[in-house]
Amino acid sequence: SPPFAPRL
C-alpha cells in the first residue's frame, strides 16, 4: 500500500 495510506 502507499506510504500515505493507513495500514489497517
Swiss-Prot record:
One of its GO terms (cellular component) is extracellular region. It is found in: Secreted. Mediates visceral muscle contractile activity (myotropic activity). Keywords: Amidation, Neuropeptide, Secreted. The keyword Secreted applies. Position 8 could be leucine amide or isoleucine amide. Coiled coil: none annotated. Belongs to the pyrokinin family. This is Pyrokinin. GO terms for biological process: neuropeptide signaling pathway. The modification Leucine amide is found at L8.
